[in-house]
Amino acid sequence: RRIAMIWFTSDTHFGHANVLKFSERPWDDIDDMNYALIENINACVEPSDELYILGDFSFKLTVQQAYELRKLIRCKKIHLVHGNHDKDWRQPEVADAFIVEPPIKVLKVDGVKIVMSHYPMADWQSMGHGSWHIHGHIHSQGSAYNDANLAQGLLRFDAGVDANEYRPVSLAQLHTRFDGVAWPARVKWPFWVNETGDARLDAFLAGEKRKVETLEER
């Protein structure tokens, strides 16, 4: 029997038919998506493991319908950081579904501080001391966003299913990913990542960066 592990995921959007289109998910039917995502979780996460879901577990479902899907996930200890589409999971009839966490959850494990939230942050607690930021919400597709973070020394990761082959990501995988990455001591706002892809914003940030460099040369 292996040692219990910690896993992260986000934005499963169980029950949300429109997510098949706007996130280009590879299923034609919402029930197929629901059960495939549950199978993927159960294939990775053992009942004794811990799973952090960083928001948007379901959408367009009643809390009871979402609860029935939750019961199909074998993991006993699932933490939920609420997203913008989540139900009130503190209701007595479903209170055993999740360990409901605050909007920003900080975990210290394996010598690392992990700052978790549904929404991504440009700057987070202890960023300059090597802390990680794990989030969801943005539905980045494929590895491009997470790879761009890594290339800039940002220990920030979108745990959403759309960015991770529709599977959870383990703490061990993130250790491997971030091992040896030189992070910035602090981030000045002109150097923040342009996550919009807007050419005008790129030009604006480039201009501000030149201003900062000019001031530092004086």
Locations of regions flagged by a protein language model:
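Conserved beta-sheet core of the metallophosphoesterase superfamily
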Residues: 95-197, 202
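Core catalytic region of metal-dependent phosphoesterases/phosphodiesterases
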Residues: 7-9, 14-106
